[in-house]
């Protein structure tokens, strides 16, 4: 497997830290040892996050093609679009963001705070569109690309989550390689990796990266899309494409893709009671914040798996914290009392 042959434009600080979640582990019985890899602390560009790691492999193509405008899409509180806006500002490029109404939730300030507020401050052309949630290609995004061309610009198309893109899985192949280096320093290997999944390329990259040492099925995706069949198909397809691209040397099978569907409800972007309990518990045990859309759901999943005895005693579990905390501001009413 060879990731080095792909050009990478550095947007992150370097390897992200691995932090023991000692108090949370003890609170949950002390039989499973929890750690977090802090992708939420990976960059100085508008709080960074998992999409910033992915964008490192897209930006060389942007520059090689002479593009002047990054065009991306997400929900109103999209972390993806905030990270694309930050990278565009960093590179001196224009940015057009399509922000669709993906979440069936209303808050007095939902479209004026958090991620979308930061994108506006970063100078992006933010376009609100009423269309609902989907993880496929969108007409509104195609129209935004065409509008840039019509104005004489040269757009570069970045799909939701950087996912359905030929290079979208590479960043998290690199994540797995980085974990292996850190495991050598720590003197032990992680038995499981827990990660949130929606558009698919984060888990897909991990599956490929950890397949290199036989741990593909130890990557446990926690679905937050509430459309698990679509998410599972996308993870599998992107993983297969990425495996071929990096020369993994074997096919990715359905058995390699583990996606837990229990924690996504009631629907995308809406937290359930377990999500909210997990957000508060992690915050109060570790001082680590998670969000109601993504990381709160994957944290809920990991906590419940520990409580249910689904990890063997003595297991070391690595929680991939992908970022997303700015979205908390969009849910101010839910958290009005903390």
From Swiss-Prot:
Task: For this entry, list what GO says about its biological process.
Answer: 1-aminocyclopropane-1-carboxylate metabolic process; amine catabolic process
The cofactor named in the record is: pyridoxal 5'-phosphate
Q: Does the keyword Coiled coil apply?
A: no
Q: Does the keyword Transferase apply?
A: no
Q: Could you tell me which InterPro entries the record lists for this protein? A: ACCD_DCysDesulf (IPR027278), ACP_carboxylate_deaminase (IPR005965), ACP_carboxylate_deaminase_bac (IPR020601), TrpB-like_PALP (IPR001926), TrpB-like_PALP_sf (IPR036052)
Q: Which residues of this protein are catalytic?
A: 78 (nucleophile)
Q: Which SUPFAM superfamilies match?
A: Tryptophan synthase beta subunit-like PLP-dependent enzymes
Origin: domain of life: Bacteria
Which reactions are catalysed by this chain?
1-aminocyclopropane-1-carboxylate + H2O = 2-oxobutanoate + NH4(+)
Residue list for modification N6-(pyridoxal phosphate)lysine: 51
| One Pfam family in the UniProt entry | PALP
Could you tell me the EC number(s) of this protein? 3.5.99.7
GO molecular-function annotation terms? 1-aminocyclopropane-1-carboxylate deaminase activity; D-cysteine desulfhydrase activity; pyridoxal phosphate binding
Fetch the HAMAP family from UniProt: ACC_deaminase
Its quaternary organisation is: Homotrimer.
Role, per record: Catalyzes a cyclopropane ring-opening reaction, the irreversible conversion of 1-aminocyclopropane-1-carboxylate (ACC) to ammonia and alpha-ketobutyrate. Allows growth on ACC as a nitrogen source.
Name of this chain's protein: 1-aminocyclopropane-1-carboxylate deaminase
Q: Which organism is it from?
A: Paraburkholderia xenovorans (strain LB400)
